[in-house]
Amino acid sequence: MLSITNVSYKYNDRQVLKSVSAEVHSGECLAIVGESGSGKSTLLKLIFGQMDVDSGAIIWNNQPILGPKNKLVVGHGFMKYVAQEFDLMPYTSVSENIGSYLSNFYPTEKKSRVQELVEVVELEGFENTKVQFLSGGQKQRVALARAIAKRPEIILLDEPFSHIDNFKKQSLRRNLFAYLKKNKIACVMATHDKDDVLAYADQMMVLHKGEVMRTDLPSAIYSNPEHPLIAAFFGEYSTIEGELYYAHQIVLTDKSSLKAVVKHSFYKGNYFLIEASLNEDVIYFKNPTAVEENSVVSLTLKR
């Protein structure tokens, strides 16, 4: 189990993290979300032992995670960290990069393992391609495969799908998180993408200016966001009479005392997002069809 207890960290007298606590068990995934600069990447670096905590403790299975003041070589054999900058070998092949941490004493097993990982990250056909010729998204997939090559006990992911296009992102998510769950690998992931969180995270931590705003099940936080910052993470929202409503919770109806003036209709594929003015406030709601601009509509609110 990963235990993070009251961890704080300062940089140049700026409080980057303050009293952060969390627990992650084997096979579980903790998703850390928040605005840029909220401390997500810093927390991952502290967990990895890349920096020293100012106070608090980080422990994995009763083993303290020490920073560079107490440990000369950064990192641990049981933990892998995939940062936003990929530390790959550009002049070697995809297979050589993925297998770089695997033993050469068992070449048959190594070859089989590399091919398994190539399939997990969907890079079939690129095994012999040098990394320097890959796209950013393909390099990110190589970095992910290399990180899980030796089946770590815990993996740290910093925006793991940020460079990957939508054509591959959905299936790659499914493959990777299924692999982590099957092999009981704990995961701590920093992300800006709600799709990383809702379907795959067991816990969700919201950081704001270095402090934990909330930690809970993703479904619980989504159902009751409590704060505009949290609601905004999940999509368009509106504040009506002091309450937060997602766009799908505001519904067009025939008659209602709640009336708004339509400003724009944005095509979203299987629905239109309608921007409207309600008592001088801007609100957003979903509708199957576009609505005429400047028309007055009646709305109802649904939870």
Residue ranges and their predicted role:
Residues 109-126, 178, 184:
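Conserved ABC ATPase "signature" region
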Residues 130-134, 138-140:
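Conserved ABC ATPase signature
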Residues 209-210:
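Conserved ABC ATPase "signature" C-loop
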Residues 56-67:
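Conserved ABC transporter NBD signature motif
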Residues 48:
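Helix-to-loop junction immediately C-terminal to a conserved catalytic motif
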Residues 65-80, 104:
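ABC ATPase NBD coupling module
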Residues 149-153:
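A short, proline-enriched helix->beta-strand linker immediately N-terminal to the Walker B motif
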